[in-house]
């Protein structure tokens, strides 16, 4: 009997994943990853975070009802190094990070998989809405989930071949409604539990306040400038802004104004028109080729430049051994440094990288 460690967040998706795997004949072990929590745990509890005490309690109750072993594992140091430190450094560098992607690759997979193999597991499993397939070329790849609205492949694009070969994602074949129906049918107390907060360690979405508290440093204001370098006014610190932003700029120009660029080296935020935030080309690094050995020059794909982006046709161009360009058929709005660009062919994830410009 194959042994699988299921990462259980206390939510309905991972709970049903554990149930489905047990029904399929696996030897299932439930594990909740303790990654971060408030000093008083209060804001995590109020915002339904995946790492508060109530999440552990819910996961433990589900494991008991499924009659599977259950453990809590401490990954706080791994989470701090790979997610929180990265999050802060990216904002300080004028980029807009995606901490969930970093958490998936380096904590939920790299760290959990290593520890699971040490206790004799063959696989790890999660409640993500994605599917894993083996392609004719022998490579493992992600395939979009059965329900497009819940598909989570964008946030999983940088998983390695080794990680994919040892991962199961049983709820990828189901819709969210079907998952809740299964949970209700077998009497799980989390059947109607709301989805968890996306960024668990900034539950109030006050990134600036979090970064000031985390670093112990005050954020330094600077200048708003136009695309020609003329000073337009003062901003409250570059971490408050992201490319494409219009609301909350705190500057009145008598016309619609958008963030075009963030310049950390001069502490400037460039403001322009809506036309200024469209581009037909981006450069990406930190590449992960998934469905192919490497990205080929001239490869045609659909590229997603943010989680809720529908995707747009583009052609991949090799820039160097570590960078590629993506040339779009139609200009794209607010291509944001720090975010992921993920490439698809049909429902298959080809791979992706991090946007640098």
From Swiss-Prot:
Q: Name one GO cellular component term.
A: cytoplasm
Which InterPro entries does the entry link to?
MnmA-like, MnmA-like_C, MnmA-like_central, MnmA-like_central_sf, Rhodanese-like_dom, Rossmann-like_a/b/a_fold
Annotated region Interaction with tRNA: the residues are 150-152, 306-307
Listed under GO biological process in this entry are: tRNA wobble position uridine thiolation
- Cellular location(s): Cytoplasm
What this protein catalyses is: S-sulfanyl-L-cysteinyl-[protein] + uridine(34) in tRNA + AH2 + ATP = 2-thiouridine(34) in tRNA + L-cysteinyl-[protein] + A + AMP + diphosphate + H(+)
**Tagged with keyword ATP-binding:** yes
Catalytic positions? Answer: 103, 200
What residues does the record give for site: Interaction with tRNA? 128, 339
Which residues are noted in the entry as ATP-binding?
7-14, 33, 127
Disulfide bond entries = 103-200
What is a GO molecular function of this protein?
ATP binding
Which regions form coiled coils? none
Could you tell me the superkingdom of the organism this chain comes from?
A: Bacteria
List the SUPFAM superfamilies hit by this protein, alphabetically. Adenine nucleotide alpha hydrolases-like
Question: What are the UniProt keywords, alphabetically?
Answer: ATP-binding, Cytoplasm, Disulfide bond, Nucleotide-binding, RNA-binding, Transferase, tRNA processing, tRNA-binding
Q: What is its EC number?
A: 2.8.1.13
Q: What is its main location?
A: cytoplasm
Reply yes or no: does the keyword Chaperone apply. no
According to its UniProt entry, what is the function of this protein?
Catalyzes the 2-thiolation of uridine at the wobble position (U34) of tRNA, leading to the formation of s(2)U34.
The record's HAMAP family line, in alphabetical order, gives: tRNA_thiouridyl_MnmA
The family note in this entry says: Belongs to the MnmA/TRMU family.
Protein name, as recorded: tRNA-specific 2-thiouridylase MnmA
């Amino acid at each position: 009997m194959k042994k699988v460690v299921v990462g259980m967040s206390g939510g309905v998706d991972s709970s049903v994943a554990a149930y489905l795997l047990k029904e399929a004949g696996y030897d299932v072990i439930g594990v909740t990853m303790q990654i971060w929590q408030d000093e008083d745990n209060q804001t995590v509890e109020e915002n339904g975070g995946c790492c508060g005490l109530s999440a552990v309690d819910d996961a433990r109750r589900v494991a008991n009802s499924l009659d599977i072993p259950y453990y809590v594992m401490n990954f706080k140091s791994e989470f701090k190094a790979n997610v929180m430190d990265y999050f802060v450094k990216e904002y300080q560098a004028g980029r807009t990070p995606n901490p969930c992607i970093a958490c998936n690759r380096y904590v939920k997979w790299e760290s959990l998989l290593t520890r699971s193999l040490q206790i004799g597991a063959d696989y790890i499993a999660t409640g993500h809405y994605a599917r894993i397939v083996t392609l004719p070329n022998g490579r493992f790849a992600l395939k979009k989930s059965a329900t497009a609205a819940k598909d989570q492949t964008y946030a999983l694009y940088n998983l390695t071949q080794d990680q994919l070969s040892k991962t199961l994602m049983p709820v990828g074949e189901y819709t969210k409604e079907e998952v809740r129906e299964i949970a209700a049918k077998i009497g799980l107390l989390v059947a109607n539990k709301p989805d968890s907060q996306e960024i668990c360690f900034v539950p109030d979405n006050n990134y600036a306040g979090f970064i000031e508290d985390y670093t112990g440093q005050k954020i330094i204001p600077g200048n708003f400038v136009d695309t020609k370098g003329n000073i337009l006014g003062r901003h409250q610190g570059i971490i408050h802004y992201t490319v494409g932003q219009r609301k909350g700029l705190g500057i009145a120009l008598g016309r619609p104004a958008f963030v075009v660029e963030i310049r950390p080296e001069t502490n400037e935020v460039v403001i322009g028109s809506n036309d200024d935030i469209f581009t037909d080309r981006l450069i990406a690094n930190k590449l992960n080729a998934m469905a192919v050995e490497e990205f080929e020059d001239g490869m045609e794909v659909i590229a997603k430049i943010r989680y809720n982006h529908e995707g747009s046709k583009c052609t991949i161009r090799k820039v160097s051994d570590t960078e590629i360009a993506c040339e779009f058929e139609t200009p794209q709005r607010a291509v944001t440094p720090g975010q992921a660009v993920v490439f698809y062919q049909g429902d298959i994830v080809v791979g992706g990288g991090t946007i640098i410009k």
